[in-house]
Amino acid sequence: MAARGVIAPVGESLRYAEYLQPSAKRPDADVDQQGLVRSLIAVGLGVAAFAFAGRYAFRIWKPLEQVITETAKKISTPSLSSYYKGGFEKKMSRREAGLILGVSPSAGKAKIRTAHRRVMILNHPDKGGSPYVAAKINEAKDLLETTTKH
């Protein structure tokens, strides 16, 4: 072991670095400090860039928030209003049958059959449609055809 105040050989200085005198410098100490300084500068620049980006985002967010909400209101209102919002009634009425097939309740038999064919092609159970919805479509067609005079 190296005694206090005595500089040990090179191999021993690495093993017992804590016993070196405070004034004695290791040859690789400058390289470590330069790397540490560079790392600290890089971290500082990264934090500054992040802060500027956050500041810019907060400034631009208020006007964008208003534009986004207005656009969402414009998109959702007209495009979704044409769809019927609600389930099926217990006993089907002519109005509901017309809504299901997409025709007027007073439409003729030819128009009802055409609408039924078009809707059933889209909702047929063999093509992945729901059997319940297909039954309601058929029920709507039967109801409208039995009450139509033409």
UniProtKB/Swiss-Prot annotation:
The keyword Chaperone applies. It comes from Pongo abelii (Sumatran orangutan). This is DnaJ homolog subfamily C member 15. Keywords: Chaperone, Membrane, Mitochondrion, Mitochondrion inner membrane, Phosphoprotein, Protein transport, Translocation, Transmembrane, Transmembrane helix, Transport. Its main location: mitochondrion. One of its GO terms (biological process) is cellular response to starvation. SMART domains: DnaJ (SM00271). The chain crosses the membrane at residues 35-57.
